Each structure stands twice: as C-alpha cells, then as structure tokens.
Regions:
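Short, small/polar residue-rich loop motifs at catalytic or cofactor-binding pockets
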Residues: 16-19, 302-305, 373
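Short, glycine/proline-biased beta-turn/loop segments that scaffold the active-site neighborhood
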Residues: 77-92, 180
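Short, conserved catalytic-motif segment at the N-terminal edge
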Residues: 1-54, 74-76, 90-91, 125-136, ...
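Peripheral terminal and inter-domain segments
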Residues: 313, 329-454
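Active-site SXXK
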Residues: 5-9, 22, 28-30, 51-81, ...
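Hydrophobic (often cysteine-bearing) scaffold residues that line and stabilize catalytic clefts
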Residues: 4, 54, 58, 62, ...
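Short, surface-exposed loop or secondary-structure junction motifs
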Residues: 29-35, 39-40, 92-302, 307
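Short, well-ordered beta-strand elements
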Residues: 296-298, 307-324, 443-445
Length: 454
C-alpha cells in the first residue's frame, strides 16, 4: 500500500483534511495505514489505533444488537412498538398504535424528531420516548423514506432496555463489543480514551485551513444512532460478521445467518438512489456498483467522518475514518484507488445532467422543509434554483451566508444534481417527487425528507 499511502497524503493536502485511516478486510485479513495528524493544534500523529467518531455508522451496530433480540424471539420486527412499550405515543393515534421496529430500522416512520432536550443521564432514551407525545408526522407512516438521525434508533434502544433490563450502553457492551473483541470501541463520550482520540475539524477556506471544531461531540441522545467511537480494525471486525454469516473472526456467533440475511435483504426503496444507492436495508444502505450489490454504513459528526463498504460477492470490506474536510468526493477518490489496486468493482460516478430535459418547472417550485431546515425552489430563466436558509448560528459556525443558492441540474423528471461553488462542499443529489396533487409534495436530499410547506 506504499503508493496508496502517498496518494492519500496528497489528497489530504488537497482537501484540507488533517488525517485519514484506511483499512481493508480481504479473505479474513485486515490491512491498513494512517496518514496525517489526529489534531492540528497538537500535531499528534494519527495511527491505525486512533479512535474516530463514527456518527451514523453507529446504527449498524445498534441494528445488529437489536437483531439478536429477534433471533432470541424476544421481539418481532413487524409487531407494533406498543407491544414492547405499552405507553408509546406520538401525535397521530394511528401511528402510535401501528408503527413497528421495521419502520424505525427503515426510516419510514415519518415521526418528526421533536424530542426536546432529554439530557445526558443514563435514562436519556426513556426520557426521549416519554417526551414525543406531541411529535407530528412529516409524512404518512410507511409512505416514503426520511432519515431519522436520532429518534428512530432511540426508540429501538428503549425497546432493548425494556427487554434486556439494562441501559443501552451496557447492552451494547455485553452483546457486541466484548464478544467481538472491540477494545477500541465505545458508545458514549465519557468512555473514550482521550489520549487516542482524533479531534474533529472544520474547513471554511483554503487560506485558514482546518480548524478544531468548537463542539467536540454529539449530545448523548444521539447514542444509538450516532455516538459510537471506534478504530479502523474494530470497524472491519464488525464488517467480518456480515461477510461470514454472523460469525466473529474467532468463530463466535454474533447473529444467526438468517438474521444477517434479513438485515441485508429486507429493503425499502430510496427516493434518491444516486448519493448512496437504490434501497435501505436494516441498519445498512444498499448500493449498486455496476451490477454488484454493495452494503454501506456511513456516519458524520461535527468534523469527523466514517465510511464502510461491504462487498459480499468479492469477500471484501473497506473502511475510511477521517477528522475533517469534504466527505463524498474524498472518500470516493480514495476508495476507487484502493478498489482499483484490489482489482475490485469501483464506485459509479454520479449521472450526468440531462441538458435536454423538458420539465414543467412550475411543478417543482415551492417551499419545502422541516423544523430548522428550509428549502425554496424557484424557476428563473428556464432553470431551477434551490435556496437553503441556514440558522444564523449554523451559518456563522460554517462561515457561510444565511442563504445559500444552488442551481438544480436535472438528471430525470424527479432527480437533480446540486453542485456547489464552494470547493470544500460536495455535490449533492436531490429528489423532488410525488406529483399526486399537481405540484411536488416532497424534497429529499442528504437522506432527509422535506414536505412541501407552501
């Protein structure tokens, strides 16, 4: 990997990323390397033992532990949540009575992430579930995919707590971390060995370069959906379970082969198939790489990013952990160079815009959003533009104006590319769809669904 190590070093400089750790699991063997520094303010070198925040990759671990309860027949994916949490209630009575764990794993519950501040104590997930009685629906139950960063998996965690009689952090240690030998992996900030931990960084301009983030961790309420910290080896050890019918590297059974198949094969379609893939499975994203099915688990926190790709047909898993910079462009470049060296299938490029697309632009125009997010889509000069309104504090944090305008380039009747003028911002993909009432009813980007507001 000598050539690739040098290449990653060049890319770190190009993208303003302090460090990256790249690893590959092939035929049961792990190899990898680290380049750069864990913290620009100290100059501490990154190593393959450096601990990074994994963000929403956490959901794969939580789903794996939840599926153990399915194996044990303690829970049924298609039974209402109320079967296990009798007092469960959101604003919609029908959703309260019928939403299931499968809806939560699929991100199709439609429940708004309206849970207030449940605090940092051990009962945080119990408090979250108790505090959502007024949570409204973003969309009807099961109608479309709309990513839930924290709430959906917090409800799953509370089910786990009730059935196991322990707090979620203890459950994860008992069910996964210890049996898998994940000695560098933890589920909340207080457990992290700070001497080994990477620091998150932001980059607002090439002149300034990467700077340490002013907020160094997510709140505890994100735990089951985003608070795992891990090393490259531990991430790939977890991937081993999916490539080997539920078995750990030492042969320990983590989940039945049937449970692994269910996690991979139970799927719901994604409105936007281009950023990740065409479907969402149970704790995994389903990708189509030139006809080869690949499973993804991704995560980002404030200034840290984690990417995992599992390739059952090739018996390969690859992972990348970074502490800053753009996400998609960097990881795709690094992964494709690694995959080329491995003579494996590479990641497809985003589609090209259809310059000849004949669209009725008025059907897309409108305001879409959810609490804290607002998108305005407008036609001008025969083109569609999207204006994102940022919270003033978020704009200051990112070094951006309060309103950011993008052109939407059509790929199809419902899909668009959204390139940025900012060299440190990735091109996004956008789906605008559901014309049952004339104008589009939903805008889906970065996995989040935003209903029409006006």
């Amino acid at each position: 990997m000598t050539r690739l190590r040098a290449r990653v070093g060049e890319l770190l400089d190009e993208y303003g990323i302090p460090s990256a750790v790249l690893g590959v699991l092939r035929d049961g063997e792990v190899a990898g390397f680290a380049v750069g520094v864990a913290d620009v303010s100290t100059g501490q070198p990154a190593t393959t033992d450096t601990i990074y925040q994994c963000g929403s990759m956490t959901k794969t671990w939580t789903a794996l532990a939840f599926m153990q309860l399915v194996d044990e027949r303690k829970v049924d994916l298609d039974e209402p949540v109320r079967t296990y949490l009798p007092g469960f209630r959101v604003a919609d009575p029908e959703v309260s009575a019928t939403v299931t764990p499968r809806h939560l794993l699929y991100h199709t519950s439609g429940i708004e992430e309206d849970f207030g501040d449940p605090g940092e104590d051990d009962d945080v997930y119990e408090r979250m579930v108790a505090g959502i009685a007024g949570a409204a629906q973003v969309h009807p139950l099961g109608y479309t995919h709309g990513y839930s960063a924290a709430l959906g998996y917090a409800i799953l965690a509370r089910i786990m707590e009730v059935l196991d009689g322990k707090r979620w952090d203890t459950i994860m240690s008992d069910r996964l971390l210890r049996p898998l030998g994940l000695t560098g992996t933890t589920t909340w900030r207080a457990q992290v060995d700070r001497r080994r931990a990477a620091t998150g960084h932001l980059i607002r301009s090439r002149e300034e370069g990467p700077v340490v983030t002013p907020v160094d961790h997510l709140p505890r309420c994100f735990g089951p959906g985003g608070n795992v910290n891990s090393t490259i080896r531990d991430v790939l050890t977890t991937a081993h379970v999916f490539l080997n019918a539920g078995k750990a590297p030492d042969g320990t059974s983590i989940l039945s082969a049937a449970g692994i198949r269910e996690m991979m094969r139970s799927r719901v379609p994604l409105p936007d198939p281009y950023m990740f893939g065409p479907a969402w499975a149970l704790g995994l994203i389903v990708c189509d790489w030139h006809g080869e099915t690949v499973y993804a688990s991704d995560g980002s926190t404030i200034g840290q990013n984690a990417r995992l790709r599992i390739m059952p047909d090739s018996n390969i898993a690859i992972a990348l952990l970074t502490n800053g910079g753009p996400r998609e462009t960097f990881y795709k470049t690094v992964f494709n160079e690694l995959l080329t060296d491995l003579h494996a299938t590479t990641i497809p490029d985003l589609p090209q815009p259809d310059r000849a697309a004949d669209l009725d632009l008025s059907r897309y125009e409108g305001v879409y959003g959810r609490p804290g997010t607002r998108y305005e889509v407008a036609a001008e000069g025969g083109k569609l533009h999207l204006t994102l309104t940022l919270d003033p504090m978020q704009a200051q944090f990112l070094g951006k104006p309060d309103r950011v305008r993008y052109e939407l380039l059509p790929v199809s009747r419902t899909h668009f590319l959204m390139p940025s003028d900012d060299p440190f911002e990735d091109t996004q993909t956008v789906a605008i769809y559901d014309f049952t009432q004339g104008g589009a009813q939903y805008l889906h980007t970065n996995c989040r669904v935003n209903p029409r507001l006006g």
